[in-house]
């Protein structure tokens, strides 16, 4: 009778790019000693589409439909950053109503993104039921998006100087009803999940990041705020009209997967607070800055030849980016989404560098999973919240 020998050498396992609980097409090459993770190497690039290069031969308006394909679960933020850059370059004022509409759309999008983080995260840990609950609420948000923008996802709604269309009749009441309903939904999630002993066993003390470490790795968003750093670009940069609302930055000091879960859950309730204030205080007026449509290069333009620049419905196709560079950023659900924009007196950007939050937050993964168990990889990766569309661009 032969005695089976115990393997002493290390085992290398490929997780992904088509692993059932892998988020998109990420591939992890994991070195294991039994159940213990010795090393982990993320391999990216399976969803690379050359988004930065595409931007260099498109006008801003032509490029707007492309940007919704970076983080395709929080598309309003990619649109916001795409129009904020040219607005700051051209010093374009956004009407108050348009700014309020933008805030409403951004916060709805933040809730939708956090919901679609929560469901798969719970499924990764082994709780299948919340996965179906979150679609119930998310569907309501998409209904609101559809009635306002015409699209459930990939809205293509923001424009330079405002938004594409005003809110339809009755939309604000419908959205307020959703806010009231959703608060009960979040309470239900907290009752169901937060004190669940099995859930706590899986996430408490797993993947701890200290405050200084988080800053050194360049983390942002819930990853940074869960490590005790109170940093939210909505408070720091004062963009749109967030200063007019009463809300708090949500943060935790533990820095583990549970803290990141708690930050995102409480961010959803803060978003509802902002939404309710914005919906109740939304001013009248135009939803778009009409001046943008008349960006004329020649000041003494003769009116005898037909020039469609002056009568176009949308911001003029000949909108020029002045010869300067600019970094703009917004607080996306996953972290700081930024764009480094270089103009050179042409309608196309000379350089359009994307700073995706998911890509930078993902860099800390190998360090977090070392000396953990194999099953913890999914917990830690889930708590980081990545979307491969923006990681690979």
Swiss-Prot record:
Source species, domain of life: Eukaryota
Role summary: NDH shuttles electrons from NAD(P)H:plastoquinone, via FMN and iron-sulfur (Fe-S) centers, to quinones in the photosynthetic chain and possibly in a chloroplast respiratory chain. The immediate electron acceptor for the enzyme in this species is believed to be plastoquinone. Couples the redox reaction to proton translocation, and thus conserves the redox energy in a proton gradient.
GO cellular component, as recorded: chloroplast thylakoid membrane
Name recorded for this polypeptide: NAD(P)H-quinone oxidoreductase subunit H, chloroplastic
HAMAP family listed in its UniProt record: NDH1_NuoD (MF_01358)
Membrane topology: Peripheral membrane protein
Family membership noted in the UniProt record: Belongs to the complex I 49 kDa subunit family.
Statement: the UniProt record of this protein carries the keyword NAD: yes
GO BP annotations listed: photosynthesis, light reaction
InterPro entries per UniProt: NADH_Q_OxRdtase_suD, NADH_UbQ_OxRdtase_49kDa_CS, NDH1_su_D/H, NiFe-Hase_large
GO molecular-function term, one example from the UniProt record: oxidoreductase activity, acting on NAD(P)H, quinone or similar compound as acceptor
Enzyme Commission number, as recorded: 7.1.1.-
Short name of one Pfam family: Complex1_49kDa
Subunit structure: NDH is composed of at least 16 different subunits, 5 of which are encoded in the nucleus.
Location of this chain's protein in the cell: Plastid, Chloroplast thylakoid membrane
Predominant cellular place of this UniProt entry's protein: plastid
Reactions performed catalytically: a plastoquinone + NADH + (n+1) H(+)(in) = a plastoquinol + NAD(+) + n H(+)(out); a plastoquinone + NADPH + (n+1) H(+)(in) = a plastoquinol + NADP(+) + n H(+)(out)
UniProt keyword terms in alphabetical order: Chloroplast, Membrane, NAD, NADP, Plastid, Plastoquinone, Quinone, Thylakoid, Translocase, Transport
């Amino acid at each position: 009778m032969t005695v089976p020998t115990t393997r002493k050498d290390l085992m290398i396992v490929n997780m992904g790019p088509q692993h059932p609980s892998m988020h998109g097409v990420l591939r992890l090459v994991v070195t294991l000693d039994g159940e213990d993770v010795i090393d982990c190497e993320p391999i990216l690039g399976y969803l690379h589409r050359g988004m930065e290069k595409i931007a260099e031969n498109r006008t801003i308006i032509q490029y707007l439909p492309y940007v919704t394909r970076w983080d395709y679960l929080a598309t309003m933020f990619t649109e916001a950053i795409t129009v904020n850059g040219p607005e700051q370059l051209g010093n374009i004022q956004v009407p108050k109503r348009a700014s309020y509409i933008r805030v409403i759309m951004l916060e709805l999008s933040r809730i939708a993104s956090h919901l679609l983080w929560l469901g798969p995260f719970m499924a990764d840990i082994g709780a299948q039921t919340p996965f179906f609950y979150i679609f119930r609420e998310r569907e309501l948000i998409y209904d609101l998006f559809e009635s306002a923008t015409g699209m459930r996802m990939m809205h293509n709604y923001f424009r330079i100087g405002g938004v594409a269309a005003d809110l339809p009749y009755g939309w604000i009441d419908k959205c307020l009803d959703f806010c009231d309903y959703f608060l009960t939904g979040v309470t239900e999630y907290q009752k169901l999940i937060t004190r669940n002993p099995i859930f706590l066993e899986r996430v408490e003390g797993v993947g701890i990041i200290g405050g200084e470490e988080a800053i050194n790795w360049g983390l942002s968003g819930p990853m940074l705020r869960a490590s005790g750093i109170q940093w939210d670009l909505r408070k720091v940069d004062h963009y749109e009209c967030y200063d007019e609302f009463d809300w708090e930055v949500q943060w935790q000091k533990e820095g583990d997967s549970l803290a990141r879960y708690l930050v995102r859950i409480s961010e959803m309730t803060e978003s509802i607070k902002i939404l309710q204030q914005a919906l109740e205080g939304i001013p009248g007026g135009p939803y778009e800055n009409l001046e943008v449509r008349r960006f004329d290069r020649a000041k003494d333009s003769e009116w005898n030849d037909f020039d469609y620049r002056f009568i176009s419905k949308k911001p003029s196709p000949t909108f020029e980016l002045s010869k300067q560079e600019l970094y703009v950023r917004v607080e996306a659900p996953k972290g700081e989404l930024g764009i480094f924009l270089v103009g050179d007196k042409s309608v196309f950007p000379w350089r359009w560098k994307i700073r995706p939050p998911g890509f930078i937050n993902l860099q800390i993964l190998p360090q977090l999973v070392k000396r953990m168990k194999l099953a913890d990889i999914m917990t830690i990766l889930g708590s980081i919240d990545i979307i491969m569309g923006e990681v690979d661009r």
